[in-house]
Amino acid sequence: MKILVPATSANLGPGFDCLGLSLKYFNQTIVEKSKFFSISIHGEGENNIYLKKNNSFVNIFYEIYQRLSGKKDNFRFVFQNNIPLARGMGSSSAVIIGAIACAYELSGFKADKNTILNEALKYENHPDNIAPAALGGFVCALTHNEKVLAIKKEVDKDLQAVITIPNVAMNTQKSRAVLAKKINLEDGVFNLCHASFLTACFLEKKYDLLKYASLDKLHQNQRMKLLPELFEVQKLALDNNALMSTLSGSGSSFFTLAYKDDAKKIKEKIKNKFAKFRVELLEFDDEGFKIC
């Protein structure tokens, strides 16, 4: 079987650990029964020996497959990884969702996407990446009684994402370590208001208000200080008609939303100024993972 799992961009400014969306940029994995166990990795991580010795996809897959089927079969795994590692584009969530979906499919259990999503919560505590990876679209999600509750909205086809991918990784643990252990009431209320308003902007297609809705006081500036060029990326995007421009997940990638004509111009301007950074112009994915 073959599975495609999309990249995701989470937080979207004020929506810390609860908002995310899905991008048409996929990791592809082929999993087949085989006489012998084997792993082949192409693309991102292909030179990382650790990913072959202790592969999270493989570990999660076997854990669930053996639990569901009661068997210890050998499989051949072929990974075509396009999602950058440790760049805030949901590479870990793509692994988790992909492994679980494959395990259910190959053990003969037909599981819906909500089942896959709730299983994923055992491996990832926050739903902001796993929810759009499973469901597609723009997603607002929370956890309640060890279940994910998610509302999905398709993203307008007139919009595109400009993803700026620095040549520097940003480890999630390190990125969380710079955050304040306590927040003041004023900042908490600010983010509640802005996350709610941002969600309403997507639901009602009030995209012109996103530049106000996407402001944040809890995490973004603290993390961007780890790579100060990101402040310049954000300013350049907003000065050239971006609807919003925010840190993607915990970084180091940066997410910019714009109408298609503006998105092309923004991509070129960022690429011209930051030659060492990758800049991708991406459509939005409204399906989530796909089994082929």
UniProtKB/Swiss-Prot annotation:
Role description: Catalyzes the ATP-dependent phosphorylation of L-homoserine to L-homoserine phosphate.
A molecular-function term among this protein's GO annotations: ATP binding
Class of enzymatic activity (EC top level): transferase
Catalytic activity annotation: L-homoserine + ATP = O-phospho-L-homoserine + ADP + H(+)
Pfam families listed in its UniProt record: GHMP_kinases_C (PF08544), GHMP_kinases_N (PF00288)
Signal peptide: none
The entry's keywords: Amino-acid biosynthesis, ATP-binding, Cytoplasm, Kinase, Nucleotide-binding, Threonine biosynthesis, Transferase
Pathway note: Amino-acid biosynthesis; L-threonine biosynthesis; L-threonine from L-aspartate: step 4/5
Keyword Magnesium attached: no
Disulfide bonds: none
GO BP: threonine biosynthetic process
GO cellular component, one term: cytoplasm
Cross-referenced Gene3D superfamilies: 3.30.230.10, GHMP kinase, C-terminal domain
EC id: 2.7.1.39
Primary location class: cytoplasm
Tree of life domain: Bacteria
Protein name per its UniProtKB record: Homoserine kinase
